[in-house]
Amino acid sequence: MSKHIVIVGGGVGGTILANQLVSKLYPEILRDEVKITLLSESPDHFYKPAFMYVAFNLFFQEELKRPERSLLRPEITFRVDPVTRFDFAGQSLHTRSGKRLGYDFLVIATGCVPAPERIEGLKEAGDHFYQYQPARQLAQRLSRIEKGRVFITVSFPQTPNVPHQCGIAPVET
């Protein structure tokens, strides 16, 4: 019976891991001893490190988007079907379409999502470029500045050592 590796998350981490696993386990995959499935919320893959440049009108959405399937080796089963529930004890998960998927090995590579509302006043007073729409909004706000200063910060008042999506981005801007 073949082993089933399920990766949840079609971002950079999930995509790279799925492809690397195929490279490492290729003989086992050919012998049908291993199968790899990648589940994602979207059929598209966005190059998120460039969202910083969206804020300066240097890139736009279509330039940063590729079909996820085009980035994956053909041996990977790719499904656009977000996970709604994990059953760790039963080694299975449930998806939005109502499917139940069993696994032998599970990787959760869903990335992180900015939550500026968790810092009082930040959502109202600040912007970020870690998602496409907020980066476009920041570009519009920056284009209206005629004079003054722009303040860039990375702040975690409760947990100062918590990593975030792109640690170097504030330095690059």
Range-by-range predicted roles:
Residues 1-3, 76-169:
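FAD-binding core/adjacent interface of flavoenzyme oxidoreductases
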